[in-house]
Amino acid sequence: YSSLREELSEAGGAVIDLSGFPNLSESVIHGLAVVASGFLPARAPVLLMDGVDHTERLLRITAELGLAGAIVDVKTIGSAPAIAALPTVGIVLSKQKSEMSVLLRIDWTPSSSDILTVVAAGMHGILSEPFLGQSEPPPTTVKKIATTLDTDIQFREKEMRGWLQQMGAANLNDLKRHHLRSVTYEAAAMSGLRLEGYRQPLPMWSRK
């Protein structure tokens, strides 16, 4: 307990991973959040994290506690799970009235299209380890890591600016779900996005 207090007192924030404690009651989760907030420096953020199957509960508890945000964890390699999570996260977010940051945690290096898709769905960004899935060995020194990340970020920014212009959005803040299109039937069926060339989502998403 004392070591936890000491560590958190010097931390910039805390993430409580609920997936590691699947049987915790909501009262215990509330208690953990209160303890973390009390031990952290003033204004340091506390976030909750859980799997995409528990998105509704995750965001509800985050809102009730007035925490800084939530992390929706998608653990399957590939872009399909992120697409499949869009309807669930988007619907739950639309019901939330409180201000919070919502991030999508993935276990692959996101492409520019992944980033735009997640932001258009109403989330605020992607959480991922750098250099995942690369064929070349990752840089090891601080200087090389910083240089590589800076180059990668600049490339993605340039690529995303071009796509935003094509979609008619001035910046990321203007990007909405209706700007997105699916290029395959499978992606359209999973996400509820409109298939390229069609004005409406697929029938299973259009039914009321």
Predicted regions located by residue number:
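Alpha/beta enzyme core
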Residues: 1-107, 112-140, 196
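Alpha/beta catalytic cores of nucleotide-metabolism and tRNA/nucleoside-modifying enzymes
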Residues: 91-101, 112-116, 120-208
